[in-house]
Design a protein with these regions (language model features):
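Catalytic cores of secreted/periplasmic lytic hydrolases that degrade extracellular macromolecules
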Residues: 1-168
Length: 168
């Protein structure tokens, strides 16, 4: 799917979420694009890489392969299955693992749950103060630990810019 096609298909969900929450639709679209590779991989309508919790019902979760960047090689207990662990030049560790993620009946369900996540978790309080600015929100969400990728904020900001350029 091209960026223009992605925007056309998923912008209505992002705009509706922005209307309800004040979170910039540009940020929402950028995060969905980043997490899915512009909808190349959307297992279980999961657009935002949201992990399943301990209390997530079995029918609402799926076991998927993912990459995590962590500070210790001794965190294998965090995952149902560890495929590999490699030390990076930064001193951090790249884990290739299987982990539980949420799944949704519809794309809209994924977009709605994603927005609620920010309001339900105190770590995003500072981010919510700047939720109308997609660039600042991306910075704060990354600082709060949404993802383990060290370049998460800069990746989001590049995609926000690409969406702005293709959003005509």
């Amino acid at each position: 799917m091209t960026p223009k096609e992605f925007i056309k298909q998923y912008k209505p969900f992002a705009l509706e979420t922005e209307r309800k929450t004040g979170i910039s639709h540009l940020f929402i679209l950028a995060q969905a694009a980043l997490e899915t590779g512009w909808a190349k991989s959307v297992p279980g309508n999961m657009f935002f890489g949201i992990k399943a919790g301990k209390y997530t019902p079995p029918e609402k979760k799926q076991l998927l392969t993912t990459t995590e960047i962590l500070s210790s090689p001794n965190l294998k207990h965090l995952f149902p299955l560890v495929i590999s662990v490699k030390m990076l030049s930064s001193g951090k560790y790249k884990y290739e693992v299987k982990d539980w993620f949420r799944k949704y009946d519809t794309p809209e369900g994924s977009f709605t749950h994603h927005a609620h996540l920010f309001f339900q978790n105190k770590v995003y309080t500072k981010a919510l103060e700047v939720r109308s600015d997609p660039y600042k929100f991306a910075e704060e969400v990354a600082k709060a630990g949404y993802a383990t990728a060290p370049d998460y904020a800069s990746s989001l900001k590049k995609i926000i810019k690409k969406i702005e350029e293709n959003n005509s």
